[in-house]
Amino acid sequence: MELNIDAYLPETYVREERLRVEVYKRIAMVEDEESRLSIEEELIDRFGDIPEPVENLIRIAQLRGVTRKLGVSHLSLRPDGVHLRLDEQHMPEPDRLFEAITKADGRLRFAVAKKPELILCERNLSPEAAVELAIPVMTKVHDELSALKTAAKEPAAPEKA
């Protein structure tokens, strides 16, 4: 991910190194809203209010989790929006992906230059705003793809005579 954003566990927040490593591992497992809320609750209970760099770290982990499911191999923030490069070997089938992004958000574009990528078109975003915007949009794309897969597996209803 190419985002110029402070995302780390300060020593002043989690003082013991062993615990910091444990917390980093737990944060790395965040992949959806439920797991994000769970780790945030745990951190508040154990260490107090969550500093901004830790909040950023958690949100980036959540974004990584959802984009990994979509076959995104690289994410970068550019002046025209968030660019998500797709791994051709792990990306969803292009027709379904196109249908899912069309349903998910009108700002998403599917581009094929050197490598296929999704572009979340929103100009001049801060890194924090890019993460906040990309999480729900990419979650919606994932949900739409899941719905399309489910619909494709369901047998057609028999015609009535």
Model-derived regions, located:
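Accessory helical-bundle/CTD segments and flexible terminal tails appended to RecA-like ATPase motors
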Residues: 1-161
